[in-house]
Amino acid sequence: FDRIKLTFNLKHDMKKLAIGVDIGGINTAFGLVDENGDLYAESVISTKKYPYVDDYPAYVEDLCDSMRALAQSLSFEYELTGIGIGAPNANYHKGTIETPANLWKFKEGDPNPDESRRVFPLADDISKCFGGVKTLITNDANAATIGEMIYGNAKGMRDFIMITLGTGLGSGFVANGE
């Protein structure tokens, strides 16, 4: 009984970290952060190495392997509380990336260029890599806006607009703190 209690207390006191992922048209960056937004480790993989619809499974495998390696690189124990992903054309409600302009296109002459094949269940795929840990996905510009509102230069602002520019163009709006 004491051993269980001790284990519970150790886990309760354990640092809680999450993985944040930013998927861009050229690179995918990810890092381990705490609830204060402090970054403990970060890494990147090439997104453009996987340009076609049929490359999506290999992309997920590379991302999962790289995220696992990063998660295991820390020299202390911690609890992984969740994974948050920002991606172009992400659907928060479905956990998918849907027909993104700069990702996973059809090869020239693809015999089945049906756009329904360009809906990618990334939140579920990544969650499975980490034993079912809660994984959420949202539009990358919205994720950047939320990050600025909580941790960045817009902290404390109730109204602002954020424009993101990368491989694509995006925006996020905050009105009355929402």
Where does each model-flagged region fall?
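Short, positively charged and aromatic/hydrophobic N-terminal segments
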Residues: R3-L10
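Short glycine-aspartate micro-motif
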Residues: K16-D22, L80-G84, F160-T164, G170
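Short, well-ordered amphipathic alpha-helical segments that serve as non-catalytic structural scaffolds
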Residues: Y59-L74
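Short beta-strand-to-turn element immediately C-terminal to the catalytic PLP-Schiff-base lysine
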Residues: V33-D34, G147-E148, G172-N176
